[in-house]
C-alpha cells in the first residue's frame, strides 16, 4: 500500500467546512474511480492547515491523484481559499493496523 500525504497551509479558516463538504461531495467520488484507491482522510489541523492522506495500491496510482486534486481545486474555484501548493510526502506504508485486536 502506498500513502500520499498533502499538507495545505494558509487555507481560509472561515471556509474550512465548505471545503470539507465539497471534498466529500465531489473530490472523493473522483478518487474512488482511480484504480487501486483504498481510502482518503481529510484532517483539519489548526491555524489554516488542512492535511489529507490518500491510500492506493501503488505509487503510480497515488501519483495520478495529484492531477485530480490539483484540477479539483481549480474546478471548485478554491484557488483563493487554498492559495498555496501542498507540501507532499509519499511512500510505502510499512506498518498498518485496523485497530481490531488479533484473535489468539
Region roles according to the model:
Residues 1-51, 57-71, 78-104:
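Short S/T/G/P-rich N-terminal loop/turn motif that feeds into the first structured element of a domain
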